[in-house]
């Protein structure tokens, strides 16, 4: 029984140590996240970017959304062309 408890304790210790080592491998400073697994591997995403499809980009660009300014201009254009 003591041998099993020692084995479980060692496994838990190994998992904890590996979990603590993960941030060491991130080469990006501060709050920047590391992203990419291709030619740009290890690219650091800035504060306004995040990792999307293994590349640093903005939320808008990643999800193909439209910002409020573009939407407003398109509505104004539509209103001008319908009169």
Curated annotation (Swiss-Prot):
Signal peptide feature range: 1-27
Q: Please provide, in alphabetical order, the Gene Ontology terms of the cellular component aspect for this entry.
A: extracellular region
| Protein modification | Contains 4 disulfide bonds.
Q: Name one GO molecular function term.
A: toxin activity
Subcellular localization is given as:
Secreted
Q: What is recorded about the protein's domains?
A: The cysteine framework is XI (C-C-CC-CC-C-C).
Q: Which family does it belong to?
A: Belongs to the conopeptide I2-like superfamily.
What is the name of this protein? Turripeptide Lol11.1
> Organism source for this protein?
Iotyrris olangoensis
């Amino acid at each position: 029984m003591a041998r099993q408890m020692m084995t479980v304790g060692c496994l838990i210790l190994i998992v904890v140590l590996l979990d603590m080592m993960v941030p060491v491998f991130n080469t990006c400073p501060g709050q920047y996240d590391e992203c990419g697994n291709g030619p740009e591997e290890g690219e650091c995403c800035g504060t306004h970017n995040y990792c999307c499809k293994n590349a640093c980009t903005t939320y808008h660009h990643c999800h193909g959304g439209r910002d409020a300014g573009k939407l407003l201009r398109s509505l104004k254009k539509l209103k001008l062309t319908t009169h």
